[in-house]
């Protein structure tokens, strides 16, 4: 999977519906703190009006192929959600070799380990610092991206996930048969 070229303009993207859960207010504050960086929200939603920083583009709803292409052009994937389950867009970004920067909530923390395969942030300053490092794309950031990509292949591929589900169902069936 090719990553965005390192000489491409520094772009940060997120993907999904613009709702309270996805924390567009924080996304906007982060963008406002980094006016030299372009931010793209791929999607739409009832809180679109909160994305007021001049360096934010909201695509509206686009076809899946276009959403993937837009994400591929970005260097960084940002997920500042207030809560998550297992965020599929995060897994996809890891597969696309994006530097991932996420909020410190269950779901995100289940997948991203701070400064191992991305950044887990709690404060505006932490997000800004992580994005600045991603813009520079130092050796650590490249290592996090590679670690995240290898983890996707080893932990979240279809075969691996089917095997994990099979184990869960087998344990449940065995427990039922014992009772």
Q: Which stretches of residues belong to each language-model region?
A:
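Short acidic/histidine- and often glycine-rich active-site loop of Leloir-type glycosyltransferases
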Residues: 50, 91, 105-115, 119-121
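A short, well-ordered alpha-helix in the C-terminal region of glycosyltransferases
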Residues: 140-155, 164-167
């Amino acid at each position: 999977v090719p990553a965005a070229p390192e000489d491409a303009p520094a772009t940060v993207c997120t993907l999904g519906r613009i709702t309270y859960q996805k924390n567009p207010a924080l996304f906007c504050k982060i963008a406002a703190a980094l006016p030299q960086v372009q931010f793209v929200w791929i999607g739409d939603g009832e809180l679109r009006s909160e994305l007021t920083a001049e360096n934010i583009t909201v695509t509206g709803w686009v076809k899946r192929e276009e959403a993937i292409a837009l994400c591929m052009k970005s260097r960084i994937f940002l997920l500042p959600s207030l809560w998550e389950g297992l965020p599929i867009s995060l897994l996809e970004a890891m597969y696309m070799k994006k530097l991932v920067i996420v909020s410190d909530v269950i779901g995100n923390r289940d997948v991203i380990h701070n400064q191992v395969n991305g950044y887990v942030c709690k404060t505006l300053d932490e997000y800004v610092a992580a994005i600045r490092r991603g813009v520079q794309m130092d050796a650590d950031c490249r290592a996090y991206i590679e670690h995240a990509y290898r983890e996707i292949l080893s932990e979240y591929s279809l075969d691996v996930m089917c095997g994990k589900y099979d184990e869960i169902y087998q344990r449940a069936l065995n427990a039922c048969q014992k009772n």
